[in-house]
Amino acid sequence: MILYHGSFLEIAKPDLVHSRSNVDFGRGFYVTPLYEQAVKWCGKFKRRGKDGIISRYEYDESRESELKTLKFDSYSEEWLDFILNCRSGKDSTDYDLVVGGVANDKVFNTVELFFDGLIDKAEAINRLRYEKPNLQICFRTEKALSLLHFEGSERL
């Protein structure tokens, strides 16, 4: 499977050292199988006057069974709870790989309203169920990263 990472620089050797904490699926290296999603991720760097660079990887899916994986097929109560724990620094899970929806602008607004206590969980789930998830994959361990092989990059 081909996966993409959007940044301001080429990342030939992904690592966990440079990852941020308190994001959707916790500390890790984020990729997507959707080229258009990687282009969107580059947008924030381009708006700051930096280059947008998409790095491309081959992911060895045949070995995914070796990883402890959490998959969210939709925006759900479980997804929302997991995002809340990760973004608030309370995630204590040991997943190698987490797969699920991206909190895009509309989804992010709903999540923020919930985090801020302005809507309850039921209302947040009701709003999210109509959204089609964009897919992100978070490689959270070195074991998971070992299945990701750099193939090249392109400047936008």
Please report, for each region that a protein language model flagged, where it lies by residue.
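A broad, structure-centric signal for solvent-exposed, well-ordered loop/edge residues
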Residues: 11-13, 38, 66
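Short aromatic-glycine-(Arg/Gly/Cys) micro-motifs in beta-strand/loop hairpins
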Residues: 1-23
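Terminal, compositionally biased segments used for targeting/anchoring and flexible tails
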Residues: 9-11, 40-43, 59
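Short, conserved beta-strand segments within well-ordered enzyme catalytic domains
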Residues: 3-5, 30-31, 56-58
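Conserved NAD+-utilizing ADP-ribose enzyme module
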Residues: 23-24, 44-156
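Extended catalytic/binding region for NAD+/ADP-ribose chemistry, centered on the ART fold
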Residues: 20-44
